Amino acid sequence: MNISKHITYAEAIKSQQAIRMRLSNEPTPEHLDNMKYLAENIFEPLRKHFKKPIAVTSFYRSELVNRAIGGSLASQHLQGEAMDIDAQVFGGLTNAEVFEWIKANLNYDQLIWENGTVTEPDWVHVSLTRRRANRKQNLRMFNNKYYTL
């Protein structure tokens, strides 16, 4: 089963921590709907624009998995509303390009430049919700501290 044209269900729920600890990482039907909404409205427009593969490094997280990795209790990954992407995995595209394109062209709740340098994040976190108005909040995270852009 696919979440969208370019994201498989297995890819969307994959977690190394869940595998190592034998934890369930299965979304509820509501969370699955949120995942599909995020994929169709953020990831697929990215793929269409750049015409290159982009790796999803973290998508859905169950409460057990989120707790095991020390994730925030308010993480939108828990609702299937957030994904971490890394354009550098396949080459030919930078995370900075992805960040700036999302910022300029898409509706989103949070867009986070995760670690890295001032010119290139290690990965990009992006979220989208249907529960309320999206904030279009732009942040940078360095050394576990968040800074508003």
Model regions and ranges:
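Catalytic cores and adjacent binding grooves of peptidoglycan-active enzymes
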Residues: 87-149
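Extended, low-complexity, intrinsically disordered C-terminal regulatory tails
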Residues: 43-69
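Extracytoplasmic cell-surface/polysaccharide-interacting catalytic and binding patches
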Residues: 1-47, 140-149
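Short, surface-exposed glycine/acidic/tryptophan-bearing loops
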Residues: 63-83
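Structural recognition of the beta-strand scaffold that forms the well-ordered cores
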Residues: 55-57, 82-86, 125-127
